[in-house]
């Protein structure tokens, strides 16, 4: 029994580095593929967005002198590399995948549209959405919110390197405590940085819940999908 029928899984590019300082750790990729395969076996339809921060981040590039638009486009290409890597890892363990791109680049990936994406999900494909929104000045978190809303996901699962949302940065403040559940209004009131404001506002306005959890611990994705109390659940209601 699963808590969700269809989810949008957001993975950070940095998490793909594993213990490395750059690029893609094959062991981390294999762990992700194993968990996602088990999730598919549970009957959950899974759409995925991966960041590109392990390869290139547009904002950082702009700070170093790159034109911001070109920097963001480089970041979009980084998400394509990560998407292809995850697609390859999943197909290697017998999971059907499709990479859809927000910018035309056939045959690397198929051009995204909502109806085709939903059709693929219903056919059992893990559908990986790359290039963010396809526009500069938008983060991959915003791309995740957009895709989650478009594919009519039950929730967005934000897989990170931390195990939820805290009152403060737990790495800097040892007294920080974790929320098991929090509303979007409280996130704004407390000034918590879960995602950028655009991404958070989109989820709030379209009533898309978020579960923030530690994806780097094998098995956690399956626990979230079973409805176990891990991570932090974010929604418009407190109960």
Curated annotation (Swiss-Prot):
Q: Which gene encodes it?
A: pyrH
Q: Which PANTHER family match?
A: URIDYLATE KINASE, URIDYLATE KINASE PUMPKIN, CHLOROPLASTIC
EC numbers on record: 2.7.4.22
How activity is controlled: the entry says: Inhibited by UTP.
Where is it localised?
Cytoplasm
Presence of the UniProt keyword Phosphoprotein in the record: no
Q: In which pathway does it act?
A: Pyrimidine metabolism; CTP biosynthesis via de novo pathway; UDP from UMP (UMPK route): step 1/1
Q: Which SUPFAM superfamilies match?
A: Carbamate kinase-like (SSF53633)
Instruction: Please name the top-level EC class of this enzyme.
Output: transferase
> What name does the UniProt record give this protein?
Uridylate kinase
Going by the UniProt record, its keywords in alphabetical order are: ATP-binding, Cytoplasm, Kinase, Nucleotide-binding, Pyrimidine biosynthesis, Transferase
Assembly and interaction partners: Homohexamer.
Q: Does the keyword Transport apply?
A: no
Would you indicate the residue range of the signal peptide? none
> Which Gene Ontology terms cover its molecular function?
ATP binding; UMP kinase activity
Catalytic activity, reaction form: UMP + ATP = UDP + ADP
Positions annotated to bind ATP: 10-13, 53, 57, 160, 166, 169
Q: Which Pfam families match?
A: AA_kinase
Recorded hits in Gene3D superfamilies, A to Z, give: Acetylglutamate kinase-like
Output the Gene Ontology cellular-component terms: cytoplasm
Highest taxon of the source?
A: Bacteria
InterPro entries hit by this protein: AceGlu_kinase-like_sf (IPR036393), Asp/Glu/Uridylate_kinase (IPR001048), Uridylate_kinase (IPR011817), Uridylate_kinase_bac (IPR015963)
Q: Which family does it belong to?
A: Belongs to the UMP kinase family.
